[in-house]
Amino acid sequence: MSVNIVVIGMQWGDEGKGKIVDFLATHADYVVRYQGGHNAGHTLVVDNKKIVLHVLPSGILHNNIISIIANGVVLEPQSFINEIKLLEAENLCIRKRIFISESCNLIFPYHVFMDLAREKQKYRNFIGTTGCGIGPAYEDKVARRGLCVGDLLDLSFFSRKLEENVNFYNHQFTNFYHTEKVSFKEIFSNLLKVSDVIISMINDIPDLLNNAINDNKSIIFEGAQGTLLDIDHGIYPYVTSSSSVSGSVCSGAGVGIKNLGDIYGVVKAYSTRVGNGPFPTELFGELDAYFCRFGNEFGATTGRRRRTGWLDIVLLRRVISINSITKICLTKLDILDNLEKILICTSYHLKGVKNKKWDSVPFCRNDWDKIKPVYETFLGWKQNTRGITEFDELPKLAKKYIHRIEELIKVPVYIISTGPDRQDIIIRN
């Protein structure tokens, strides 16, 4: 049987999934993106060179890897082509190693304009989206008016449906949002410039992947965002528009659940999130500034400064349960090197409720504002861990921190990232 791995973010995205996938892809045949769009930003550092991918799977940097964009993804054509050109400028030959599902819904400029128009209208209650048009594109998919990659094979049909959609959105822009209209001719003309490249990559992805499984090939399914942003299991309404849990591999790529192997959960040694929404362990002041500076906590897609906080075991336990996570990949351990003390949230107290201890998430969304984290405190190791590749070489207090995380979540920490480069990794047996 083939060895298939699902790589899932355990927080609010930005956990370092790209680096983990890039590392694991050394022994893989396929890497598959199965949900999300170009709102994801996966940062890789190879030979001290930083590469940020938004659409293409992180395994694309390996010459032997076939990269798949499956049906659960929403694809913005120009961003996709730009990313290909970016990698080709690095002398990577990739076009013949990329396949796209005919069922991928496409993102158009009217989706982006709608995204931004809505955020402007919400004022203080905005979600904090990336403004990439992801939400409106998924809305069109669910409303059954979306245009798919496969529709490009019949340009007469495509043109007619696109004009209908442009008229649909322009009506809203004019009458509800009081913004400028979008041009059908401009959108269609720009799409024609890149359509041949996209058409050349269309393939039957479920058939391709299931044949690969039968041939004992190794497949990595690369998640985007994180479980706490999942449309169903995230902290609603501050969520993304797709399902970012392990179960979405089946619907987003067209493979059966029995063909999934290990579920790797990627988690930072602390917490971050971009955008608005509850964040029980959020830090402010000097500690927040420390993590932003030394962790370079700025969004790969938006450039926005990430909010920072301590590791939250309550949320991690829930994420492990939802995803059936079998192995933990702990990233950015080295960012904790200079701290005097390190905290882990092990439970919550609900403000105003005496002696009430919470070991799970609240039922009422308003209760998120009343949560007070309960912490365990650890002494910092105050030693350099960057670039360490053997677990036994870690400082004693760093190992104690990792062991305590394992005790609390009941899942082994298998991979530890000790720096940005692809070689800064510890594998535990």
Curated annotation (Swiss-Prot):
Q: Which PROSITE patterns has this protein been placed in?
A: ADENYLOSUCCIN_SYN_1, ADENYLOSUCCIN_SYN_2
Give a yes or no for keyword Ligase in this entry.
yes
> Which residues of the sequence carry a binding annotation for IMP?
14-17, 39-42, 130, 144, 225, 240, 304
- Pathway of this protein? Purine metabolism; AMP biosynthesis via de novo pathway; AMP from IMP: step 1/2
Q: Locate the residues binding Mg(2+).
A: 14, 41
Residues given in the record as substrate binding sites: 300-306
Q: Mind telling me which Pfam families this protein's record contains?
A: Adenylsucc_synt
Q: Where does GTP bind?
A: 13-19, 41-43, 306, 332-334, 417-419
Where is the protein localized?
A: Cytoplasm
According to its UniProt record, which protein family does this protein belong to?
Belongs to the adenylosuccinate synthetase family.
Spell out the protein name for this chain: Adenylosuccinate synthetase
* Gene name, Swiss-Prot/TrEMBL: purA
